[in-house]
Amino acid sequence: MQLNIYLRDSKLSHPVFKTMSEIALFIINSINEIDVGQVDRFVGELERVYREKRKVLVMGAGRSGLVGKAFAMRLLHLGFNSYVLGETIVPSVREGDLVVAISGSGRTKVIVTAAETAKQVGATVAAITTYPDSPLGRLSDIVVRVPGRTKSSKMDDYFARQILGIHEPLAPLGTLFEDTTMVFLDGVIYSLMTRLGIDEEYMRNMHANVEL
């Protein structure tokens, strides 16, 4: 599947809209690169945790951590016992719990160390990363590969951008991985809704009613 995004002439030269279109196109094209079997195993493990009333603990560093927080929030709306590792109010990880580790590189030391500890106490570790052969990917029970910018793709992008007259990447650093993971996890939430028979009204009732 290869799609093109057409911008109105008035927006072609605007950096905000050009960047938005680049990110959207990357996310759409990444769909074919994400393995269905990996996704089904990940969703199935989440369903097991829900039905067995176990805990889901999500972790990530930096912007990946923010993506993880958004995912944990939606899991809470579905009725999961979900937490974000690193927050002040987090219960201990037990056997049968699921730890979801988000790291584009799969090498972030604090994430790898926490995943190793989770494995030692008997938890299942699911990694979302661009590099399945990374330290995080190798130690995880479940790996979902989500595309992101790599060293080789940077070189390919460089020559393509030279031809187009674009000399700087429009989506810097880990932006493409983080945004793609965010959309992917929203898809996971909808899959869980259908599997568990949960509708939007239920989620609305689970939403916080005392907010700052």
From Swiss-Prot:
InterPro entries: PHI/rmpB, SIS_dom, SIS_dom_sf. GO terms for biological process: carbohydrate derivative metabolic process. One of its GO terms (molecular function) is carbohydrate derivative binding. Residues 46-198 form the SIS domain. It comes from the Archaea. Belongs to the SIS family. PHI subfamily. This is Uncharacterized protein APE_1940.1.
